[in-house]
Amino acid sequence: MREEEKKTSQVKKLQQFFRKRWVFPAIYLVSAAVILTAVLWYQSVSNDEVKDQLADNGGNSAYDNNDDAVEVGKSMENVAMPVVDSENVSVVKKFYETDAAKEEKEAALVTYNNTYSLSKGIDLAEKDGKDFDVSASLSGTVVKAEKDPVLGYVVEVEHADGLSTVYQSLSEVSVEQGDKVKQNQVIGKSGKNLYSEDSGNHVHFEIRKDGVAMNPLNFMDKPVSSIEKAATQETEESIQQSSEKKDGSTEKGTEEKSGEKKDDSTDKSGSKESSTTEDTEQS
């Protein structure tokens, strides 16, 4: 009986305890404090692990990895005329296009040492024949800056993805091999050369993609990506033309062989008829 009375008394005390207004709020606060402490502890441990990993990687995060970084500014450049003052400069010799009119083809020929050559770029000159500042058409690295006895001073600037620009017939240069140049930066002055004397005081400008000359006038004020697209298109067209020529040659050869077989069978048939006729006459 006493044990039952003790249990009953304990239950009543608990009931009285929980009936107090501050009990449940206190329980909630304690629970929240425990949960918050656990969360903060977990975050602290996670941050320590991340710091350890960064320390192992030399302190570099994924955003610090510049190996795959894209030079957005350069890729967004448009091809510019290689002159500081383009208003007073005009094209005096164009790029030789195989599908151009006869007159345009003749005008795009270069005569040197009694030999005709195809113009692989454009010649730019001022109307009054004076020299002018030549600037970089695109940003890049100077891979060549030297004097040629026939072409004058030559500067070649290398860009990304097999693209390069060439500047010839310069009277002087203001850059050296290995220099980094920005678009529209002055790299030299126009001049005269022996290779294209009829162009007078000029600069010869070329755009090359993987060593192949492209018509600069097709890309002026257009993004660099347009050169890549044009080069890809030309390659595809060249492959298609080669394939068509190959198919045409195969068909022609097949027709010739078929004709030979037909002629041979005709000859054999004629021989048989002739033999039959002779046998009949002898009879």
From Swiss-Prot:
Main localisation: membrane
Gene Ontology molecular functions: metalloendopeptidase activity
Keyword Membrane: yes
InterPro entries: Cell_wall_metabolism_enzyme, Dup_hybrid_motif, Peptidase_M23
CDD domains for this protein: M23_peptidase (cd12797)
Xref: Gene3D superfamilies: Glucose Permease (Domain IIA)
Keywords linked to the UniProt accession: Membrane, Sporulation, Transmembrane, Transmembrane helix
Source domain of life: Bacteria
Basic and acidic residues composition bias: residue spans: 243-271
GO process annotations (BP): sporulation resulting in formation of a cellular spore
Residue ranges, annotated region (Disordered): 228-283
GO cellular component labels: endospore-forming forespore; membrane
Membrane topology according to the record: Single-pass membrane protein
Compartments, as annotated in UniProt: Forespore membrane
TM stretches of this protein: 22-42
Quaternary data: Interacts with SpoIIIAH and SpoIIE.
Role: Involved in forespore engulfment and required for anchoring membrane proteins on the forespore side of the septal membrane. Forms a channel with SpoIIIAH that is open on the forespore end and closed (or gated) on the mother cell end. This allows sigma-E-directed gene expression in the mother-cell compartment of the sporangium to trigger the activation of sigma-G forespore-specific gene expression by a pathway of intercellular signaling.
Protein name: Stage II sporulation protein Q
Organism: Bacillus subtilis (strain 168)
Gene from which the chain derives: spoIIQ
